[in-house]
Amino acid sequence: MNSIDLPSLAEATPTIRHDWTREEAAAIYHAPFADLMFRAQTIHRQSFDPNAVQCNQLLNVKTGGCAEDCGYCSQSAHHDTALPASKLMDPKKVIEAAKAARDAGATRYCMGAAWREPKDRDMAPVIEMVKGVKALGMEACVTLGMLSDAQAKQLADAGLDYYNHNVDTSEEFYSQVVTTRSYGDRLDTLAKVHDAGIKVCCGGILGLGEKPTDRVEMLRTLANLAQHPESVPINMLIPIEGTPIAATATPVDPIEFVRTIALARIMMPKSDVRLAAGRTAMSDEMQALCFLAGANSIFIGDTLLTTPNPGDSKDRQLFNRLGINARGELGVHVHSHG
């Protein structure tokens, strides 16, 4: 383990960098736990309220039948997961769901469709959804797969605020997870989204069989982009029967997960770090450590796409125990985002 110079941490400022090396990122990740947490919490407090958590709502507007072969995903047409494919939801029903989320305190709404990439004919109903959400006074986010420049511009013109497009893991490990697209394809879409003026939401998944080095490299890739993603969701794998990775997945050590959250906060000090999927398998104590390490955002509701989530009642109890700001219907500072 590498020791970190504590006096320098006390004077740490949230400097935005895009030139992190493998060696320094790894040294931070593997530092003594107390030193790592101190540095992450110090940086976190300089940009965020340490007692506030952003809450995000996510709706699956098109389920299953995806042409990609992501080894963890129940929505891939390549896997036998007994998940029926559905058509794109009626925009009116999506907007009704967004209104319910707004009435529960949400200010941002994310809509996900299980596509490799949207066809041009898909854009009109998606744009209707985006405009409908915006008309409710909410921010809008979508995740649709890869985009063309023209599609990114269409979404920007419709007023889209955020686009979610995760890199999942490191470039070195990526081919062990997905073979139907390249890591470069993901980065290319991120560039198109950024160039269109849409904010980027991009993170990854822990528990795919990756090594700690892969977690470090995933975050280093994001931190070294021309602009840091405005949101960085960190997911813990929920193994789904019928997916290839479920057969070989091993649980992520809780401390290793917390280290990843801390590294994300240190390397991307102004970004929201989202404690995303997998919270049903986390103890309250593990989640508390993640918040202490710099996580300032979660997903609310009973489900995330096709996987379970703790639900508002349980989250409210946790937030009350931790003294998290009591604002909004859930009892926290509420936004809604994917």
UniProtKB/Swiss-Prot annotation:
Pfam families for the chain: BATS, Radical_SAM
Residues involved in [2Fe-2S] cluster binding: 110, 141, 201, 274
EC number(s) recorded for this UniProt protein: 2.8.1.6
Annotated catalysed reactions: (4R,5S)-dethiobiotin + (sulfur carrier)-SH + 2 reduced [2Fe-2S]-[ferredoxin] + 2 S-adenosyl-L-methionine = (sulfur carrier)-H + biotin + 2 5'-deoxyadenosine + 2 L-methionine + 2 oxidized [2Fe-2S]-[ferredoxin]
SMART domains assigned: BATS, Elp3
GO molecular function: 2 iron, 2 sulfur cluster binding; 4 iron, 4 sulfur cluster binding; biotin synthase activity; iron ion binding
Pathway of action: Cofactor biosynthesis; biotin biosynthesis; biotin from 7,8-diaminononanoate: step 2/2
Domain of life: Bacteria
Residue sites binding [4Fe-4S] cluster per the record: 66, 70, 73
The keyword Transmembrane helix appears for this protein: no
Gene3D superfamilies linked to this entry: Aldolase class I
Cofactor: [4Fe-4S] cluster; [2Fe-2S] cluster
Start and end residues of each Radical SAM core domain: 51-270
Record function comment: Catalyzes the conversion of dethiobiotin (DTB) to biotin by the insertion of a sulfur atom into dethiobiotin via a radical-based mechanism.
Subunit note: Homodimer.
Protein name as it appears in the record: Biotin synthase
UniProt organism field: Rhodopseudomonas palustris (strain BisA53)
Organism ancestry: Bacteria, Pseudomonadati, Pseudomonadota, Alphaproteobacteria, Hyphomicrobiales
UniProt gene name: bioB
